[in-house]
Amino acid sequence: MITLTPGHLTLPQLRRIAREPVQLKLDPASFAKIDAGAKAVADIAAKGEPAYGINTGFGRLASTHIPHDQLELLQKNLVLSHAVGVGEPMARSSVRLLMALKLSSLGRGHSGIRREVMDALITLFNADVLPLIPVKGSVGASGDLAPLAHMSAVLLGVGEVFIRGERASALDGLRVAGLAPLTLQAKEGLALLNGTQASTALALDNMFAIEDLYRTALVAGALSVDAAAGSVKPFDARIHELRGHQGQIDAAASYRELLEGSPINQSHRDCDKVQDPYSLRCQPQVMGACLDQMRHAADVLLVEANAVSDNPLIFPDTGEVLSGGNFHAEPVAFAADNLALAAAEIGALAERRIALLIDATLSGLPPFLVKDGGVNSGFMIAHVTAAALASENKTLAHPASVDSLPTSANQEDHVSMATFAARKLADIADNTKHILAIELLAAAQGVDLRAPYHTSPKLAPVMETIRGKVAHYELDHYFAPDIAVIAKLVGERAFAKVAPFSFASEQ
């Protein structure tokens, strides 16, 4: 059970919400603020004075006054008309994050929503009744309207859900959770729809996956150093302290620890090779830069996870209703775009190491890591697959945040595209996962070929894990299943756990 304290969510809590079957409860300390916000809205609605989102239309129709007897219909119509998403359903882990983030935002008491509505969301979450939310349809301002409308429609008994993973109607989902359809009151539909929770949830969910891939890449890169008989001197702490970037310093320390005590490395200490190619030698510099970007993105996304991104905002102490632009997800878009750059570079560097290993001139290993080259092609086309995926990532890493299209008759004339920026991270991460799987296989093959010498004590379990699933590549065979099984292990964090490093979300 995780207690949600609005405005005080942590990255470890968010990772658990995405990855573990935890349940939620709202911190009772938030109840007074929530109730005060709801009362403030009720008082404004009763007076009948125009206030955006409470008794007016929306977007370009903000100047249209809505009579008191139509306020409930206004909120219902808002939810139903905005539920226009398309595409595949959002991943379960992202939906769980989305719901938790929405609860945190509402729970700060500046949205004017009743606790009854929040309790219904928590009940659905804890019953494992998750809204079916199409993943496409948001431009990231005014908030993530379409995705959040699909979440909200379920509270009205409209739309679809997943009941413990099985697709069903919203009414069936409410029944399983022991709920009845709600009637939303003034401002509540808008409070549910307005916000950056979809883009932030997608960005966080994919960030956690990319963090795991980063740690796996440290392990794969270190194993490739041994496979290529590379030097550990470029990882000397003194080099990296002189430059000063913390990510680089931390990455170099990881490589030193992973490769410490390697018999392969000790076997060629006195060789006449002066410098390794950049894909081996400059790993701390490249991976360190990725790490710095990822840490910054995590900081931004944590702030956004705890933010109130509704509009308008209710200030119960003064009774004011202030319209602003906290729904604009530009910070999320930038963070997601930076994560895309980092994830693509992790894959690009791994692809270069694969290319090095299969090149006999550079690695000193048999061509394409197989005996009887010619009749056997070995890792030749596995590298082509890695190259294809790395190239695809370069296109996917193009920043989404530089694009904008005006909407709502030019009332909403600049948007963030944060949801697309966050959503495409999943494709980049999947490509990088498979590149790393190919590198792990190639590096393990190279280490085998260095016999009788072995890799380091830290990397020995990695070899055991790989060889426990995939045998040494003796002769050409149907290769795709080998890649698939190692990619599955990468996704399960089997190799990430070996890295002597952890992110803030894992602590």
Swiss-Prot record:
Pathway: Amino-acid degradation; L-histidine degradation into L-glutamate; N-formimidoyl-L-glutamate from L-histidine: step 1/3. Keywords: Cytoplasm, Histidine metabolism, Lyase. GO terms for cellular component: cytoplasm. It comes from the Bacteria. The modification 2,3-didehydroalanine (Ser) is found at S142. GO terms for molecular function: histidine ammonia-lyase activity. The keyword rRNA-binding does not apply. SUPFAM superfamilies: L-aspartase-like (SSF48557). Its main location: cytoplasm. CDD domains: PAL-HAL (cd00332). InterPro entries: Aromatic_Lyase, Fumarase/histidase_N, HutH, L-Aspartase-like, Phe/His_NH3-lyase_AS. It catalyses: L-histidine = trans-urocanate + NH4(+). Contains an active site 4-methylidene-imidazol-5-one (MIO), which is formed autocatalytically by cyclization and dehydration of residues Ala-Ser-Gly. There is a cross-link at A141-G143 (5-imidazolinone (Ala-Gly)). PANTHER family: HISTIDINE AMMONIA-LYASE (PTHR10362). HAMAP family: His_ammonia_lyase. Belongs to the PAL/histidase family. This is Histidine ammonia-lyase. It comes from Burkholderia orbicola (strain MC0-3). The gene is hutH.
